[in-house]
Amino acid sequence: MSIRRKLLAAIALLTLTACAQSTIAEQKPTVSQPADSVRQWWCYPLPGAKVISSFGKRDGRGHSGTDLKTVPGDKILAAFDGEVVFAGTFSGYGNLIRIKHANGLETYYSHNKKNLVKVGQRVHAGDVIALTGRTGRASTEHLHFETRIDGRAVDSARYFDHNSHTLRLSAFRKTKSGYVVRK
């Protein structure tokens, strides 16, 4: 195993551990909001990854997600609790998983080498749902990560800081049943 692969594996392991002890960008827990109330309800979908293409215009057309590069076959994690509403092949997405979350939020995970979940399955933040690949319209192994609100693609950077792999808590609001995305 090359030094680069070992380093990426170590980073992924450390980040995966951080999933269970997630830190949050832009807001720290306070006495009235204990640390446990902001942990374990979200996870960065591909620990150790780097952004290789952002949301927005690309090559004269729209790009509806954020492309995250890592080593082939890496574990893709569910970003939030939810229900799998699609797991199969879909056009340029290749192998795609769509997960429906609370308050109109859906996350898409595509170009997967292998999908590991089935339609109707409930998943929790941090569950392994797929392996990174190069299916569909993809020029390299990566994860195309997409967030949608009520069916409309929105920049996932609204919810995640892709450099630090942290959550932007300001994009969510707390309810009796947990956190939901602000519309």
Residue map of PLM features:
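Bacterial Sec-dependent N-terminal signal peptides
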Residues: 1-29
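Surface-exposed, glycine-biased beta-strand/turn segments
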Residues: 21-95, 125, 154, 169-183
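Residue-level recognition of beta-strand microenvironments
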Residues: 54, 87-88, 115, 132-135
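Peptidoglycan cell-wall recognition and remodeling modules
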Residues: 61, 107-113, 134-141
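Short acidic/polar mixed-charge low-complexity motifs
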Residues: 74, 103-105, 152
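Zn2+-dependent peptidoglycan hydrolase active-site motif and core
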Residues: 78-116, 146
